[in-house]
Amino acid sequence: MRHYEIIFLVHPDQSEQVGGMVERYTKLIEEDGGKIHRLEDWGRRQLAYAINNVHKAHYVMLNVECTGKALAELEDNFRYNDAVIRNLVIRRDEAVTGPSEMLKAEENRSERRERRERPEHADGAEGDDSNDSDNSDNADE
């Protein structure tokens, strides 16, 4: 069996069906003896360019190990499902199980957002303390 990275884009009006689609696709792979090494739902994102006058899509990424037969069936499912507006299948040399760059970037963004919010509250408290110490120094003079 070979390893593949599969990314598919779902029409934004069909986002609620993504869970069912992922279940169907994982079931198809596992019934043929394959394995799902990584599954990431990247959510609804802006497209770089419009596809059929659609500017956003729901992104899903799978790293799988499967047979050629299962992959062909999966690609047929993508082709005949109107909700899937694009798909990409890349053959990999080995299983990839760590978080993707997209997921890492999202985590970094949320961490930076949290850090930005914390110092604002901390700076306000420190600013009050430093002003008090400055005032007490001035009072001693």
Swiss-Prot record:
GO CC terms in record: cytosolic small ribosomal subunit
GO MF annotations in UniProt? small ribosomal subunit rRNA binding; structural constituent of ribosome
Please give the InterPro entries that the UniProt record associates with this protein.
Ribosomal_bS6, Ribosomal_bS6_CS, Ribosomal_bS6_sf, Ribosomal_S6_plastid/chlpt, Transl_elong_EF1B/ribsomal_bS6
**Key word RNA-binding present in the record?**
yes
| Acidic residues biased stretches | 125-141
Q: Where is the composition biased (Basic and acidic residues)?
A: 103-124
Ribonucleoprotein: is it a keyword of this entry?
A: yes
> Any coiled-coil ranges, and where?
none
Q: What is this protein called?
A: Small ribosomal subunit protein bS6
Q: What is the lineage of its organism?
A: Bacteria, Pseudomonadati, Pseudomonadota, Gammaproteobacteria, Pseudomonadales
